[in-house]
Amino acid sequence: MHAALIAALAAHPQAPALHTVSPTARGYAGYRAWLDRLARLESAGAHLEQLGESVRGEPLLGVRFGRSQSGRCSLVLSGLHPMEWIGVETCFALMDRLNDAPPEDREVWCVPLANPDGIRRVEANLRHGRRRMVRHNARGVDLNRNFPRYWGRFSLARLLLGPLFARGAAAASEPEVRALAERFSQAALRDRGCRLDRALSLHSFGGVVLIPYGAFWRRTAHYAEQARAARDVAERIGEETGQGAYRVLQSARWVPGFTAPGMELDWFYAEHSALSLLVECSRKNQRLSAPSAWFEPFRWFNPTDPQQLAAALARALTPYVRGEA
């Protein structure tokens, strides 16, 4: 791997491992340690690349598995909403599987920490016992409302809930989104001999697989194909987790009247005509029966022991990401 990338990784301080929520919660330091180890390996099956920087200068890192210029590409994102660590854990579990058996007929790109500043803020809150909801990046922008497709459309959710769904000053105004939109644009991938035909974003919670559009009530031109892929994933998740099949919904129809302009899901589809899925990881494992959990936002989104669920979700998602199902 490039010495410059290793030096850049070493230049960013890392917090100690997190044990506040669970002994198995790795926290930002654990996630970065996994990526740092990869940067030091001479592996033919994986390549680590810095795609950009966050508002506060943290590296935005992507990992490519499989052969470059193979013609087809999958993209996996997690951590856009930094409270949703089960999505991040699932992405790392998926990367473990891809690293063990890299695909031979496509590239798979994973960006596991798409909002590093937000993840570090959540971790700091947990360490200090602050029960706060964190959805945004360091500038208070919801990165999943900042992508450069349909960004300017009216949203009732944003009108009623204001800052919770803050979209930013302009489409792709945030450095994290801008880096993703530039690096994985149709033109940039075409120059590298690749076409993105599958995309996946990992969130929490709700036990739902969402398909485009989020910005419109109407269905996409490829609705039947999108829905079929989503049902296959939802059924495999049910089999692997033992929680039953997840629901499949068009994003804009999940909460009637609450559209979501500027989503990554719509950008995947509008930019690439790709199969585009958003998985709301976890469903029956929030353990909110205790009243004390009602006032801890982190527990709304994450199981106490995330790694077992993450491993099951990764098994279910691997065929989709590899283009095998």
Regions found by a protein language model. Name each.
Residues E58, R67-C73:
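Proline/glycine-enriched tight loop/beta-turn segments at coil->beta junctions
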Residues H2-P59:
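Short glycine- and acidic-rich boundary segments immediately preceding or forming the N-terminal edge
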Residues M1-A25, W151, A157-A325:
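C-terminal accessory segments enriched in acidic
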Residues G71-L75, E84-T220:
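Active-site/substrate-binding loop(s) of hydrolase catalytic cores
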